[in-house]
Amino acid sequence: MCRYPHLPQTLPLVSRFGLRTLLLVLLAWASVCANGEAADKIPGLLTVRDALTLPNHPVRIDARLTAAGQSDDRPLAGVLLHLRIDGKAIASQTTNQAGQVSFDYLPKMRGTNVINLSVDPAATVSAEMRETTLCVWERRRPIVLVELESLMQPGAASSAPSAPAGSVGRPAAEPVPDAADELSKLTQYYYTVVYVPGSESASMGNDAAHTLRQWLVSHKFPPGFVAVPGTGGLSATLDGFKQDGWTTMKSGIGRTRAFADTLLQHRLEVVVVPELPKGELPRKAKGAHDWKDVRKKL
C-alpha cells in the first residue's frame, strides 16, 4: 500500500502543467501574502536632521517616528529603527513613548558622511527610509551660510523645491545657472557650507529638511549642513552655532533683504545675488550681478 496516497495524483498534475507553471503560482501566492501584510502596516514618517561635530568628538543623532498624515503628529512608540553610516550598520534602537530615538556616534575623520535610518522590516509600521548628513568639520575652517532662495531661479522660490526632479508632486524649482559650480569651487578647499531655507520650508512640515536635501543632491550642489530654522528663526539658529563653538561663521550668500539684514545684525558679511534694486540693498551688504561674480565679493 502506498504510504502517501495523494502522491500518484500530484505527479501527473505537475507533469501536465509543468514545474514552471507551479512555481509561478507559488510566487503569485507569496506576492499576495506580502501585499496583504504591507496593507496591514501603519504608514509612518521618519524625521531626522543633519548632525554636526568635530573629529573624535561624539555626536548625537536624533530621530522621530510619527504616523503619516496625522495632523497632530501622533508618535509611534516601540518601533525598532536601524542606523547606518556610509553603508555600515552602527546601531539599532526602539522608539520611546514620544516616538523618539537617539544614537550616539564617534566619528574619527573630517568629512561628510551619509546617515541612513530605516524601520525594521518586521515592524508593524511602514516608513520610507531617510538619508541625512553627518558633517565632521574642523573649527578653523570658515563657514559660509547660503540662503536657499539664492540657488533657485527667480519666481521659483515661491513654489519651493517640494519634490526632487523626476518625483511625483509639484514641479521642482530649477537651480540658478552656475550656482552649483561656483559654490563647489568655494567649498572645495576653503569654506564649509550651511544651507538655510526660508519661508518656503514652512509648507513642507516635518519633512522639510529631507525635501530640501534631495533637491540639493539632485542638482549637484556640494554637501553641507541643512539648518532649518526653528521657532526663533534664523537669528536663533546663528546664536546656536556660536554657542556650540562654531565661531568661524563669517559670511553669507543670499537673495532677500531679510536674510542680509539678519546676517549684518550678527556682524557677518553678506553678498546678495542678484543685486537688489538701488535703495533696497542694505548699506553694508555687497551686491553680485550673478553667481560667477560672488567669489570676487567674498
For each predicted feature, which ranges?
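Short, aromatic- and glycine-rich surface loops/edge beta-strands on solvent-exposed regions
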Residues: R110-A123
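Edge beta-strands of extracellular beta-sandwich domains
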Residues: V125-C135
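Short amphipathic beta-strand segments in non-cytosolic proteins
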Residues: L80-A91
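Glycine-centered loop-to-beta-strand initiation motif
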Residues: T94-P107
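Beta-strand-rich domain onsets/edges
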Residues: E37-R60, L134-E138
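Beta-strand-rich structural segments
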Residues: G44, L54-D73, V79-L81
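Conserved, compact domain cores that house catalytic/ligand-binding motifs in diverse enzymes
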Residues: R139-T231
